[in-house]
Amino acid sequence: MNIMKKLHIILIAAAVIFATGCNRLDVAGMVINRSDTEERVADWLDYNAQNGEPVIENAPDEYRIYSCSDSHYSERDSIVTQGANDRLYHYITTMRNDSEALFAIHAGDMVNESGEKGFVMTEEAIRYNPETQATDKPCFLVIGNHDVYFDCATFFKQHFHTSTYTVAVKTVGGHQDLYVFLDSGNGTHGTRQLDWLEEQLSNRDKYRHCFVISHNWLFRTSYNYTTTPAANLPQDEQYAFMDLMSRSNVNMVIMGHFHMREQRQFGGVQYVMTDNLNEDVETPSYLVVNVGAKVTYEYQELAEE
């Protein structure tokens, strides 16, 4: 293939990415991405080995979790951290003032451009504010594709440390629930992470309920009418992943990425796409999951103050 033909293909690909992705993108920063899934997962697992993984003790037998995604902080957005225009802050505040909520999830895409600023804003938005928040409940995060573009994975690591980990919940009634968080920032979970995931799910019988959280939505949608980098997992990986979810009796897989609400039932597993908190949408919303004898969920529109 000659140089001009290669250049033509690259330009077409870049145009497709720009047209189908989120707005305000630096296309070069998306295409030239030096962060590798396998290397990141090795870093995440090393961090876990040194620091342990979260365990929530003495939780009620029935509780709620909140899940959002795609807040896409940008220096150019009209955001005042922990202020009137900060949707992520309002989301976290709502969760921390809900007496039945246990923790929050952010399913990836915290930023929308290069640089550290968006990660700083995210960290500030989820920081406990005793003046407006009743309790200091945690927010667990995973990395999204925008969080690895522009070589931003280093900033995610500095601020949030890991994106491949588990959170175990132990209730007062003797139940245990498992939450597994994954890195799909490059449009794949990678070999090592999938092996690790299968190992975690090999103990599924110990748990009442099991949830898996990752950024990239698995299915085609009306929005996702073309293939873009990190749009969906490779097809063979998608099939293997969904087979593992079904064989392991996973209750729910929570994902984001496409800025819309969508639900699919496949192989006995409920797949749910959270809506988004992006400043560009008029009606941002998030997911509330009720966990007890059964698992139910509903979307809630964000009530801005």
Segments from the language model and where they lie:
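Sec-dependent signal peptide recognition
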Residues: K5-I12
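C-terminal motif of bacterial Sec signal peptides marking the signal peptidase cleavage site
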Residues: F18-G21
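N-terminal active-site segment of His-dependent metallophosphoesterases
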Residues: N23-G118
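Extended active-site neighborhood of metal-dependent phosphoesterases/phosphodiesterases
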Residues: S35-E53, E57, G115-H209, A231, ...
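Residue-level marker for buried hydrophobic side chains located in beta-strands
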Residues: I65-S67, H106, L141, V212, ...
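Active-site glycine-centered loops adjacent to acidic/histidine catalytic or metal-binding residues
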Residues: D70, G108-D109, G144-N145, H215, ...
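Active-site-proximal segments of metal-dependent phosphoesterases and phosphodiesterases across multiple
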Residues: V80, Y207-M255, D280
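Short, solvent-exposed aromatic-acidic interface loops
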Residues: Y299-E305
